[in-house]
Amino acid sequence: MSANSFGKLFTVTTFGESHGPAIGCVVDGCPPGLELAPEEFTHDLQRRASGKSRHTSARREADEIEILSGVYEGRTTGTPIGLLIRNTDQRSKDYSNIAQQFRPGHADYTYWQKYGIRDPRGGGRSSARETTMRVAAGVIAKKWLKQRYGVLVRGFLSQLGQIRPAGFDWDAVEDNPFFWPHAAQVPELETYMDALRKSGDSVGARVDVVAGGVPAGWGEPIYGKLDAELAAALMSINAVKGVEIGDGFASAAQKGTEHRDLITPEGFLSNHAGGILGGISTGQAVTASMVLKPTSSLRLPGATVDADGSVVDVITTGRHDPCVGIRATPIAEAMMALVLMDQALRHRAQCGDVGEVSPRIPGQVDV
């Protein structure tokens, strides 16, 4: 297996390259009867799309979805759902000067070592263009989770370089190109990114994603833990170098009396665990965050070697994101939704006859 598929009961297989004729995916395991139309994909695909602000890549793709199979008269049939998006704004000539060079910090060298051949145009299969189809598949998962269980998956940018939110408002997240939760800071982010872009450098970021309404009981110990699969899903996103569940690495500095989430009949008093204990959901919000490294495609020269082993300086032209984290929020949401839908179906398959178990503790209460 070449690991282009994700999930067990609800599976997603993606295909295509950044500068190929098209990208696509096959979604299998979706229950029948879910209403699904091409226009339902537009919102999330446009949230992920480049060319929407001066702070992202200038590449402009229409990202119009084509449903090839698995939907009849507007409803899923239970058979594989084929989705396709045609690439229309490739500029492969921008990569001719680095076709034989390995960009430091990029997958050029590792793909070459693994396969002995690589597609240098836009990064080929290693390009974040592939995540477009993850977002498309996530649209299906988000809708099913919301309709079936009332689960709402949403995310936001929680750090850009050294800048962190000075406040939080979910309503602000969708009103700016950064998915930033504090509207008053958006001008600061604009100024920072303008200066960064002019310098030719890039910067890292952090994205938080939250799923509210997840019932207690989802997750499979020992090797199918909800948090383990969520961490793997987020780590599979391009440029991600770290993932936290709940308080994550901050837990190392906490005492047990600080970290444990006390329980009352009215609900949990905190959520340091991120809504998961023993690999199984608690009924609280499932929370995770991921850190993305700075973009490695830079206009600033950097030392490397070429395919002949000669020392060269590489300069990347073309259209690239100075901060990949700016467009990563919809991708993180999609991956969490895919994990949750797969886990929901697996839980239903094994434990659907268990029924309501008492006591059922509500989610976190305000204290």
UniProtKB/Swiss-Prot annotation:
The keyword Lyase applies. Keywords: Amino-acid biosynthesis, Aromatic amino acid biosynthesis, FAD, Flavoprotein, FMN, Lyase, NADP. FMN binds at residues 125-127, 238-239, 278, 293-297, 319. Reduced FMN (FMNH(2)). Pathway: Metabolic intermediate biosynthesis; chorismate biosynthesis; chorismate from D-erythrose 4-phosphate and phosphoenolpyruvate: step 7/7. PROSITE patterns: CHORISMATE_SYNTHASE_1, CHORISMATE_SYNTHASE_2, CHORISMATE_SYNTHASE_3. NCBIfam families: aroC, PRK05382.1. This is Chorismate synthase. The lineage of its organism: Bacteria, Pseudomonadati, Pseudomonadota, Gammaproteobacteria, Lysobacterales.
